[in-house]
């Protein structure tokens, strides 16, 4: 493939945009560098770059585009609303309709509020949990990304009883000292952390199915134990379902797993491709939020009619019969095919799959927590990424990210992807 125009535009972008990208995950730094491909158009399961190359897209904008690019039903809804105005600064009926559909799908959202991103959603759940409990400390699990607000950009201490340290320049040490980080799926470490800090913990942040160091499911009983222990100490359980809501079935992961939090943050998919975030949960907790309570949250763009209209249209697509069964079928076909090729070429790799999402790790052990994902071979992934890209397969440029299937992917797309992987693996010796 030729990338001449992408390289030219990326060089121009470097003159005006810091680092040439508006989010660091879009750079190719984690896969050895080089100019990221500049895309021009998306249609269904495909992306087209400025050089005219076509890609089968498994990045899907890091998750939101579950119905594929430019889905006609969602596009029509956006066009209709844009003609009526995109922002009023007043309540609209669309907010009510969208909230009703969300609560029907995710019953734990007794009351909810809309914001504009997953970062805002998680940030606000922390504020609300602190207001409700009158406590300050937060527990999070290593490797889970909860947005770029200060409190969640914190690295683990040397053990569960140790406080965190800043994971980004500009995060004060005093902020990091309010966060305890423990390994996912390690209930003994969680018990130890709560033994030391439980009476000061406002909330634990949990991805019920992890999506930020690949797709990692909870061990049986882990989420139930986290709920029980947290509530024993008077803390709240907050689920970050920014990636997982509507990813695996029509609803949230909590409904699939039958384990429920006190508060939930959501985003990505539910906006139909437009900026969105939201949070909700128990009514008594949510009543801490202004104008009813003392915890302040506001936003000029929050609940804007364009995102509400797109979200409603998105749910109308996903609630159709057979959508998630087909995603699961294609996901299994892709997983099985990749595993056959791994065996054929004697590649050291393993796959985690949850329905229509999967992660290929270049490691010989099953990944159940962050350290195992971190130890996967990044150089091998970088080589695989570039070999696939040059055959028209668009993956996330990071060994930690998932491959996302959409309602538009077909058997033929899976077969083309497997042919590309066959060649890529053959070149990795």
Swiss-Prot record:
InterPro entries: 4pyrrol_synth_GluAld_NH2Trfase, Aminotrans_3, Aminotrans_3_PPA_site, PyrdxlP-dep_Trfase, PyrdxlP-dep_Trfase_major, PyrdxlP-dep_Trfase_small
Swiss-Prot/TrEMBL catalytic activity: (S)-4-amino-5-oxopentanoate = 5-aminolevulinate
Gene3D superfamilies the record matches: Aspartate Aminotransferase, domain 1, Type I PLP-dependent aspartate aminotransferase-like (Major domain)
BP GO annotations: protoporphyrinogen IX biosynthetic process
Gene Ontology molecular function, alphabetical: glutamate-1-semialdehyde 2,1-aminomutase activity; pyridoxal phosphate binding; transaminase activity
Localization in the cell: Cytoplasm
UniProt xrefs under HAMAP family: HemL_aminotrans_3
Family: Belongs to the class-III pyridoxal-phosphate-dependent aminotransferase family. HemL subfamily.
Quaternary structure and interacting proteins, as annotated: Homodimer.
Protein name: Glutamate-1-semialdehyde 2,1-aminomutase 2
Upper classification of the organism: Bacteria, Bacillati, Bacillota, Bacilli, Bacillales
Gene name per UniProt: hemL2
């Amino acid at each position: 493939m030729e990338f001449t125009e992408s390289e030219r535009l990326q060089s121009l972008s470097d003159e005006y945009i810091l680092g040439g990208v508006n989010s660091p995950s879009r750079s190719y730094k984690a896969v050895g560098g080089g100019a990221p491909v500049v895309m021009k158009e998306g249609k269904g399961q495909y992306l087209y770059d400025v050089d005219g190359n076509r890609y089968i897209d498994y990045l899907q904008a890091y998750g939101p585009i579950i119905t594929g690019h430019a889905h006609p039903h969602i596009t029509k809804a956006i066009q209709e609303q844009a003609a009526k105005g995109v922002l009023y600064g007043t309540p609209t009926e669309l907010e009510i309709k969208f909230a009703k559909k969300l609560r029907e799908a995710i019953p734990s959202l007794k009351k909810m509020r809309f914001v504009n991103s997953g970062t805002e959603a998680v940030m606000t759940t922390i504020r609300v949990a602190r207001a409700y409990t009158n406590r300050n400390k937060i527990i999070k699990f290593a490797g889970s990304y909860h947005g770029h607000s200060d409190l969640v950009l914190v690295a683990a201490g040397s053990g569960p009883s140790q406080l965190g340290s800043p994971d980004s320049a500009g995060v004060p040490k005093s902020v990091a000292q309010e966060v305890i980080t423990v390994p996912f799926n390690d209930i003994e470490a969680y018990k130890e952390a709560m033994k030391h800090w439980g009476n000061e913990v406002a909330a634990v942040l949990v991805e019920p199915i992890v999506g930020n160091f690949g797709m990692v499911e909870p061990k049986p009983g882990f989420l139930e134990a986290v709920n029980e222990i947290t509530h024993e100490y008077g803390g709240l359980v907050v689920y970050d379902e920014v990636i997982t809501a509507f990813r695996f079935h029509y609803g949230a992961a909590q409904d699939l797993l039958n384990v429920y939090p006190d508060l939930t943050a959501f985003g990505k998919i539910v906006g139909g491709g437009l900026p969105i975030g939201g949070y909700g949960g128990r009514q008594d907790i949510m009543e801490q939020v202004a104008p009813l309570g003392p915890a302040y949250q506001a936003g000029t763009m929050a609940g804007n009619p364009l995102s509400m209209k797109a979200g409603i249209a998105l749910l109308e697509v996903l609630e159709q019969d057979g959508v998630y069964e087909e995603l699961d079928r294609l996901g299994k076909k892709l997983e099985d095919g990749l595993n056959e090729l791994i065996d054929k070429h004697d590649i050291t790799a393993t796959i985690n799959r949850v329905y229509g999402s999967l992660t290929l790790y270049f490691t010989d052990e099953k990944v159940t927590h962050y350290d195992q994902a971190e130890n996967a071979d990044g150089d091998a992934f970088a080589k695989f990424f570039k070999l696939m890209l040059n055959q028209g397969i668009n993956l996330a440029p990071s060994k930690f990210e998932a491959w996302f299937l959409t309602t538009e992917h077909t058997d033929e797309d899976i077969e083309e992807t497997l042919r590309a992987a066959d060649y890529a693996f053959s070149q990795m010796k």
